[in-house]
Amino acid sequence: MLIFELSKTGRQAKAQIPRAVSKNYSIPEEFQRKSRPRLPACSELQVVRHFTCLSQKNFSIDTNFYPLGSCTMKYNPRGVHKAASLPGFINRHPLAMDNESQGFLETLYKLQNYISEITGMPGVSLTPMAGSQGEFAGVAMIKAYHQSRGDTARDEILIPDAAHGTNPASAVMCGFKVVEIATAPDGDIDLDELKRKVGPRTAGIMLTNPSTLGLFMRQIKEIASLVHQAGGLLYYDGANLNAILGKVRPGDMGFDVMHLNLHKTFATPHGGGGPGAGPVAVGKRLIPYMPLPVVKKTDSGYHWATRQDYPQSIGRLSCFMGNAGILLRAYFYMLVLGKEGLLRVSEFATLNANYLLKELTKVGYTAAYPDRRASHEFILTLNSEKKNYDVTAMDFAKRLLDYGVHAPTTYFPLLVPECLLIEPPETESKEELDAFVAVMKTIREEASKQPDILKAAPHTLPVKRLDDVKAARELDLNYFATHE
């Protein structure tokens, strides 16, 4: 039911908070509405019940196992949220002067240093407000670097065919042409093709390591050497940093710039359209181009660095500092776990993934790369299930919802047919993993004996199987278009 269907003329919810605006204040007539807004007329209780019921129908990390591949849906510790909500942080105004913000600035300065140590890169800017914006910032810095050297012929970015979709989008937004590099049969990047395509027009290469196939790129040092010898730079997509946290540093692999997804690796909240944060870390040669502001430390305390400090900066990406509340959560997460705790994060994440992969193959599923160990995630291919039972990966994904499990990432990466990309984060217990295996075993048995159950799934959710094509072509987004 939509909230408009609860509406009754004359019903209202009185505000219980005093108005901030004086009653004597009036909006100029030219800016005043000529008709009432079409808002539902409901009581406060109706509104609370309506949205509470909707929230109970959602899948969430707090309520369900959430093995969404390449998304690292780990638990968000409540103590971290509490620390980030201390009055000294949440009551600070974004325009507060440096001398009134020393505690806040010191915290961000320490976060910059922690990220530098984790990534093996000396420069850090916290200002990007999402992983995708951090990615854009990284590519923009690569462009600024080449332009400052007069190397304007470099107009190509190399990107593997298993990359995240944001990689080519960021490259194109910065004015580059995308050159795709194929994946070899063993899951690694095709080195021979890379050697053919790298050259004087190469500005850089964008990689995720481990890749989105759930495999660690074993020839990364050779790849770095090839690209650097050609005059290009290496960009690290931090989407899968959870797999190598404390074990391997991107800077030590030869990467020049990267972004971090705080909502993945450092347990800040996912989704909801924001807020987010995607800090960037850079090697020495890209420090002059970092987006502002960054925090610097002097004898007089902590201060915002300005364009005067970084005249070649690519500039601002957001108002103020970015999403400070998310940055604080990441800082306290690092502080709570410490160096040893962060190391265990990657160890348990890879242990969970490899255990789950092994158990799923025991009950009949096929690994996309059976000769390789998983990193923090892995891919099953349901090609044989489609051929034998006429059920698809999407059918399996929809049926999982009936068992209270959020579906894994489906049909991505595109180069694996009937693909399920599964990532069990380090916060999940062995009992939870075993329960998931039992559900997957049951669904596979259903596929072999009663495939129609899968084809019609989900059966228990308020929204059943949707007609994706019709939904895309016949948009119905306006309640009043059909309810005048």
UniProtKB/Swiss-Prot annotation:
Keyword annotations from UniProtKB, A to Z: Oxidoreductase, Pyridoxal phosphate
Keyword hit for Oxidoreductase: yes
- Chain positions with N6-(pyridoxal phosphate)lysine modification: 264
Question: So which residues are the signal peptide here?
Answer: none
Instruction: Spell out the reaction equation it catalyses.
Output: N(6)-[(R)-lipoyl]-L-lysyl-[glycine-cleavage complex H protein] + glycine + H(+) = N(6)-[(R)-S(8)-aminomethyldihydrolipoyl]-L-lysyl-[glycine-cleavage complex H protein] + CO2
Give a short account of what the protein does: The glycine cleavage system catalyzes the degradation of glycine. The P protein binds the alpha-amino group of glycine through its pyridoxal phosphate cofactor; CO(2) is released and the remaining methylamine moiety is then transferred to the lipoamide cofactor of the H protein.
Entry protein name: Probable glycine dehydrogenase (decarboxylating) subunit 2
Q: Which gene encodes it?
A: gcvPB
